[in-house]
Amino acid sequence: MITFLGLYDPVSSWLHLVSALGFLIAGFFLVRKAWGSKLRVAAMMLYTFSLVFLFSMSGTFHLLEYQTAGREVLQVLDHAAIWILIAGTFVPIHTLMFRGPKRWGVLLLVWLITIPGVVLTTVFFSTMPEWLSLSFYLGLGWIGILTAYLVVRQYGKKEARYIFYGGLAYTIGAVMEFLRWPVLVEGIVEAHDFFHVFVILGAGYHWYFVYEHASWPIYKKQIFIVKHNPDRTYFRAHAKGDCLRLESDSLDDLKIKMHKLIEEKYKGKLPIEKVILEFFEEEEVLF
């Protein structure tokens, strides 16, 4: 491998370091779009962490000199981060798109596989064959077939296309890595660099899917806090756990607006089962 500016794997290193910065910035937009629900925001933050952790560990590992302690440590962290990213990608998708067992059951399964996977990869890293570790990663990742099936069944094929694109990109990259093909410029642009390109592409497809759905309502019950002045000539409502706000000069009109808003917000998404209004009367204090 030919070094450049002190980077021992220059293409792979720069690709992933730039991607780490890019996904960190992109995470801000995810959180902003998800704002209003603590669960949504937590899912976006975990997902963003998994992306930044993987690409920063990988980018740093590839810039270090071969057969050094630092490179060996970061290589182990890099492989552990693959598990974290795969599991982390399931979190926002199942949080946003499903409820009940389809949400928590699948996430429990994924993390029950991921945690031992991280431990085994870390402990047996030096003795584990590459084909076995790649098989583990692909096996966990292709639980995404179940995710895609559930999305297709509930929302239609079009809604799941970016999940498929991302999974396909990851798989193509893994096959290239295993076959050590293609080699464009020996010592500079090799199969491993193409692998990184397809990892970025797969992560990008999945990020876009999550972003498209980041503001989806996730609760089956929506509570609105309704405030009004003493003579009931002004009403203002905001939703608990979501960024929904309404104003009106009558309660009946407020309810009509609320019905339209809920209908629009939940159209084609998880159905809402109940809307609850909690009233709060505003009172002026004179000094």
Task: Identify what each model region corresponds to.
Residues 1-218:
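Multi-pass alpha-helical transmembrane bundles in non-GPCR membrane proteins
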Residues 3, 180, 250, 254-257:
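Terminal low-complexity, poorly structured segments
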Residues 5-6, 230-232:
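Generic alpha-helix initiation/capping and coil-helix boundary signal
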Residues 95, 124, 244-246, 255:
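Hydrophobic alpha-helical elements and their junctions with loops/disorder across both membrane
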Residues 219-230, 245, 252, 256-287:
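Short, charged, surface-exposed hinge/linker loops at domain edges
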Residues 234-236:
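Short aromatic-glycine-enriched beta-strand elements
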Residues 238-242:
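Short glycine-enriched loop/turn motifs at secondary-structure junctions
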